[in-house]
Amino acid sequence: MKLTCVLIIAVLCLTVCQLITADYLRDKQKYRSVRLRDGMLNFKGSRQCADLGEECYTRFCCPGLRCKDLQVPTCLLA
């Protein structure tokens, strides 16, 4: 009987802790540093190749694109 009461009280305490923590963290950002890092990796200036329609006089075009010299060298479909 005592063991059952102790287990019930322990489960209730853990549940209350979970609810308090969830309420406190509701407006907080989760894994903010990971999102910032991913944003920096996908930033337009950090990519190694130039995408469709981008200038290609300082970078190579991405795979499947070719640098065409119009007025300004631009990556176009091959």
Curated annotation (Swiss-Prot):
Expressing tissues: Expressed by the venom duct.
One family name in Pfam for this protein: Conotoxin
Originating organism: Conus arenatus (Sand-dusted cone)
GO molecular function, one term: toxin activity
Positions annotated as propeptide: 23-47
Principal location listed in the UniProt entry: secreted
Name listed for the protein in its UniProt record: Conotoxin ArMKLT2-0313
Taxon lineage: Eukaryota, Metazoa, Spiralia, Lophotrochozoa, Mollusca
Keywords: Disulfide bond, Knottin, Neurotoxin, Pyrrolidone carboxylic acid, Secreted, Signal, Toxin
